[in-house]
Every structure is written in C-alpha cells, then in structure tokens.
Amino acid sequence: MKLTSLSKNANSTATAVTVSSIQKLPFLSLSETLPCPKSSRKPTFLPLRCRRRPKLDLLWGKFRVRASDAGVGSGSYSGGEEDGSQSSSLDQSPATSSESLKPRGPFPYSLSIALVLLSCGLVFSLITFVKGGPSSVLAAVAKSGFTAAFSLIFVSEIGDKTFFIAALLAMQYEKTLVLLGSMGALSLMTILSVVIGKIFQSVPAQFQTTLPIGEYAAIALLMFFGLKSIKDAWDLPPVEAKNGEETGIELGEYSEAEELVKEKASKKLTNPLEILWKSFSLVFFAEWGDRSMLATVALGAAQSPLGVASGAIAGHLVATVLAIMGGAFLANYISEKLVGYVGGALFLVFAAATFFGVF
C-alpha cells in the first residue's frame, strides 16, 4: 500500500512539474512579452450597415446593403479598397437603371392640336376631292376666303411693325412665350376684325335693300390700302438708312418697333406670365388700326367669315414664326420698298377680284 501511494504521489508530482514546465517554456514566455497587433483582436465577421433610402426607391424594390471598410488582419487596407469599389458600383447601378426606367415626357400639347387640325383639313380636302375632283377643291378654297386672307395678311405682315416687335422680343425672352403672346393678340384682333366685317355685311338687311354695301365697302378699303402701300413705297428713298438713322422722311418699321420695345419693355422680365402679357399687349396695340386689320375687316364683309379668319390666322402664324426664328437677320435683307409694292399690288388684285365676284 505504501508503495502504491508513493508511486501515485510521484506521478502527481511529475505531472505538476511537467505542466508547470510547459506553461513556462522560454519561447512562450518571450512571445507573451512581444507587442501584439490590434488587428488580430478584431472580429472576423463583417458588420453590416444599412442606409435609409427614399420611399421611391423602396417602391421600385431597391434595397442596398453595404459592408463597412473594416478588414481582417494584414489585408484590411486592400479589403477596404475592394469594399469601396463595390459600394461605388452599387451606387452607380441604381442611377443607370433609374435612367433607363425613366418614363418619356408627355406629347407636346400644341403639336397635338396642330396635328389634329392638319388631319381634319386633309380629311376635308380628300372628301371634297372625291366628290367633285380637283376643280372643286380649288373652288372651295377660293370661295372660302382662305387664300385671299392668307396672301394679304402674310405679305402685309412681312416687314411690318408687329413683325419686328416679335423679332426683338424673341431675342430677349423665350421664343415659345413670345410666339404664344403674339399669336394670342393677332388671333383676337383677327376675330374682332371678322366680327366687324360681318356687322357691315348685315347692314343691307337692316335697310331692306339689295345693294351690297358690305362688298362695296370692302372693295373701297382694299383699293385704298393698295394705293397707299404703293405710294408709301414710292416715297421711300432708294437706299434705306442703317443702324437706326433717320431717312429724313420717316423712321422705318424696324426703327419704330425698336423704339417701342425699348420704351415699353425696358425692364428685364423673368416671370413667364409677364412675358406673355408684354408680348400680347405690344403686338395687340401695334396691330390696332393697322392695314392688315382693316384688310381683314374688308374680307370678312365680302367673303366667308370662317375662311377669312382661318386664312388670316394662318398668315399671321407663318409671318410670326419667320420673325421669331430670324427676324433680326431678315431685317438686313428685307427691302421695304419691294414689300410695299408687292403688298399694294396684292390689295388691288383682290379688290378687283371681289368686284368681279371671282372670290
């Protein structure tokens, strides 16, 4: 028994010595004294960080999780770069996808109206052509007053005061706003002129007479403006003054329009409604009492009001678009004498056509 107990004590003592020696080996104790890097104590998992996104992204099913820039061990710096590049690629991919999924803008309202009107005109022309042939189409257009109104208004407005007012305003403000304001004024003026002409046309019915007073008044007005346009063109000097200098007889239409715009629109406008109103008011009051207005009155008294109104508005539209797109450029090449002669000749031609019942 004593031998057994002694052997057990010896074994336990040897085990204790062995453990103590193992715990205190020289190289292990030396390793404990060496500085240990802090990166070895970092957790080996990558913490996740969520960013709150707008509701719009959540509706489209976009949810993004980005890992932090923390790395493990000696590769922490390169790992941060990889995470940064990954996050940048994640940042760029929703932008490109949102651009590809961006819906197209609505179809322009003014362009849709123009297409509808053009389609209606083509359908009407096709029906008339099928029923009566090409001659019926030309007769319908001629009798409606559209051709006469379009020709007279277009020639009268080229180089007119309202033409240059629209051109000068378009150089300062948005062209679309200037076009809308100018066409609003010209359309209203055209409708008023046609209504006045219709009133003159109804005068003979009130006096119970068969004498076409309205047509005679229209012929007189057309002849008056034709002769006046030719006389004004004759009185102009052969070489017009440039850069706003006076000719000794009168200021040109461009100079008058420039003075009017400087006086009435000297303050720079930023509100779209103010630009619309300024374009409307300047063109409306410049057009009031002009030869194109009185020519519309004369045509409205002698021909179909609807055809005259549509032709006059179409002529105003074409002339105003030309003024806005390149009126200042055309001002250097437009001859006021030539415009006066051509306009006067057209007035006389349509006066004779109205007298003989061609239109």
Swiss-Prot record:
Residues passing through the membrane, by range: 110-130, 149-169, 177-197, 207-227, 269-289, 311-331, 339-359
FT transit peptide: 1-66
Protein topology in the membrane: Multi-pass membrane protein
Region feature (Disordered): 71-102
The keyword Membrane is assigned to this record: yes
GO-annotated molecular function: calcium ion transmembrane transporter activity; manganese ion transmembrane transporter activity
GO cellular component entries: chloroplast; chloroplast envelope; chloroplast inner membrane
Iron listed as a keyword: no
Compartments in which it is found: Plastid, Chloroplast membrane
Keywords tagged on the record: Chloroplast, Membrane, Plastid, Transit peptide, Transmembrane, Transmembrane helix
Biased amino acid composition, Low complexity: 85-98
InterPro entries in the cross-refs: GDT1-like (IPR001727), GDT1-like_CS (IPR049555)
Single GO biological process annotation from the record: calcium-mediated signaling
General function of this protein: Probable chloroplast-localized Mn(2+)/H(+) and/or Ca(2+)/H(+) antiporter regulating Ca(2+), Mn(2+) and pH homeostasis.
Name recorded for this polypeptide: Protein PAM71-homolog, chloroplastic
Native organism: Arabidopsis thaliana
Lineage: Eukaryota, Viridiplantae, Streptophyta, Embryophyta, Tracheophyta
Encoding gene (name): PAM71-HL
